[in-house]
Amino acid sequence: MRRALVAVIALAIALPACSGSADPATGTTGSGATPSAVADPATGSTGASTGVVEAATIPEPDAWIPRRVGVLVDRLESVWEVRREAVRRWVRTGDPAAWPPPEEVELLVLYEQRIYRVLAANDRLAAAVLGRLDGGLAAEARSNVRAGSALYDHFSPVKTLPDFRTRAPEPADRLLRFFEEGQRRFGVTWQTLAAVMLIETRMGRIASSSSAGAQGPMQFIPSTWAAYGLGGDIRDEHDAVLGAANYLHANGAPGNDRAALFHYNPVPAYVAAVTGYANAMTRDPELFYAYYNWQVFVRTTHGDVRLTGPGL
């Protein structure tokens, strides 16, 4: 279809142009349950949390990430619990239809994201940490690490920092409505559409066109957009989501999501990453609100460089 953006997507590496050939693998990414309808997997409750996140539990934007297995496991478990509470409170008693998100949510999610980037780049450390997790965190962490590792293994870091333009994304609930509309109209799960935008532009935070000319929050080549964009604006989030849903539906989704995603971007690592994040949101739909707050990083030969988020 098109080529998917320059490196910054999950890892700051340019993805090659789509060939239009189908992936022989098949599979779907799950149900269409929405965050507002999901129960807490740990307790079965759908009630709002009344807890208050203590300031001492909120990490600074560049807080240290331990490399000792036991310490890292403890840190990930504690931050995961606090983040889930903070997200649940934001979704159920706050206003996820407005920008910006609560600072506590941004900071907690950022710390988790940085941990997963460390694990994705270190197979031995990841295996040791994942082996000591259980329950919902274990499943979520496996999805995040495997998706990140697939992209890390396939793409190399860049030597120089690309010139990216970034911006604030549309509010979380507004994007979610667009994804749900794409599911209603074309049958492509909202989780798949959200995972595509997550990888392509971090939910619209990347405003630049790619080096290959792909444009907008779903990174379409203009010629492909002309065929599948339904007459909309390539840079408009609503129109881009519907165009992506139309394209994926035309190439096998739902029912053969992997083949459809391979048409979207013919890189197995990309297909694996989208599928992993989509499956994670299928297991826990409220995870969408965490992924929504993932920031733009560029993976360089000198280490990660963060371009968006708290403290910048």
Feature roles, as predicted:
Residues 97, 164, 209-210, 229, ...:
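Residue-level detector of alpha-helix boundaries and kinks
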Residues 170-185, 191, 217, 222-278:
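Alpha-helical segment that forms one wall of the substrate-binding/catalytic cleft
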Residues 207-210, 274-275:
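Short, solvent-exposed loop/turn and secondary-structure capping segments
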